[in-house]
Structure formats: structure tokens, C-alpha cells
Amino acid sequence: MEQNTVLDVRDCAVVLDGQTLLSGVSFKVCKGEALAVIGPNGAGKTILFKALLGLVPFQGTIKWGEGLRIGYVPQKFPVDKTVPLTVREFFLLKAKRFWFPDETFLEHLSHELSLVGLSQEVLERPVGELSGGQLQRLLIGWAMVDHPEVMLFDEPTAGIDVGFEETVYHLLQRLQKERNTTILLISHELSIVYRYADQVLCLNREMLCHGKPHDVLHPQDLTRLFGEGSFYKHENSAHRH
């Protein structure tokens, strides 16, 4: 595995209950890069992330760099509203895991929460009382609080108000520039892919294209992904194919 390579995937496939959910996926991600994964619903995007994290059995080879800390923000995170766990207690579970002194960790946490638009007041609120958008911000903060080298985001702006979406994507850029974080991102927004991704991986149960967005996202590729008559945005222009 090359020194600058964070992730090397070769001929990855996922078969569950006799059904092939993903096949023929190969790509590499280098340190500090942003890879966007796109495709229609049911294309295997989330399944790929679960395979990368070892949450589902897979065929082929998935190699991570040694000793990497990995943060993961799922698209959905069910919360039992009856569990009396505050945001502070939720994060202190992670402090125990990484052996941070509680007070030092909470000082650091306040800064990380501010990056996702949450104030210190949220620390005393029960997790089950947070709105969908607040919970999504909380999960982003949870994933990045221990400064992982790699972060996986499954549609990070799902459930977040439109006004905060740009803040999230600017945050991802900031993590890249200031912490050299490697970003893997599932998105349905092609305008975001063009603006923020170094690489794009196109899935529809198999790998249809992979490379720099401007090099591989041609109308015929998007038709194969999303079907005839679909709309997509490319920079400031709207195209139909």
C-alpha cells in the first residue's frame, strides 16, 4: 500500500441473503482527498460505507492505512426518546473511550460544537428532545470531536435546514485544509460534488465511473445513473438529458 494512500478498495462486492447489492468496486483515496459517492436510491452507496467500516460481510479487498481513526456520520440515527441521556453525557461516553479528562474534554467539545452551530446550552438537553436538524449536527460533532484522520458522511445535510447546508460543506472543506482530514461523502447533489470533491465514484449496484468530477460526469454517465430525462446541476448551469 502506497505511503500516501489512506484507503485501497479492490473488486469489492456485497452479497446478502443471496442478493448482490454491490459488485466490481475498486478505487483508492489519498490522504486529505474528498471522495463523493453518487447514485440513485438503492444503488449500494450506504452498503459500500458499511462494507468499508466492516459492518457487513464483503468479498474482495478493503485496506485502510494503519492506525487510522475513522469518524462516521450515518444518514439516520434512531434515538429512544425515553432514554434520560443528556448531550453532555452522550459525549462523555466518548471521553471515557479515549481517556480524556472530563473537564479538558468539555472545553474541547464546546469548540467543536460551535463549528456545527450548536451552543453550550445544548449540553444539558436530553438527546431525545433534539430536533432532527440538531441531532444531525450533534452526530457530525460526535464524529469529528477526537480529530479522526478519515470521516465518512452519509448525506450529512439530511434533515438540516437549507440555510445550514452550506455551513456543513464549508466545514468539510475546513477539516480538509486545517486538519488534512480525508473525506468520504455520499451525496445526491451534483453541484456539491463539482464544488467540493476531488474524486467521484458513481454507483448503481456496480461501479459505473470513477475519477475527477469534470472528467467523468458526462451526460451519458448521468443517464446510466439516473435515467433518461433526469435533471442535474453543473456549476451555474442547469442541464437536461
Residue ranges and their predicted role:
Residues V200-P213:
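H-loop (His-switch) and adjacent beta-strand-loop-beta switch element
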Residues H147:
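Conserved catalytic motifs of ABC-family nucleotide-binding domains
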Residues P126-L130:
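Conserved ABC ATPase signature
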Residues D215-H241:
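ABC ATPase nucleotide-binding domains
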Residues M151-D154:
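Catalytic Walker B motif of ABC-type/P-loop ATPase nucleotide-binding domains
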Residues T104-V122:
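Conserved ABC ATPase "signature" region
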Residues S187-H188:
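H-loop/switch region of ABC-family ATPase nucleotide-binding domains
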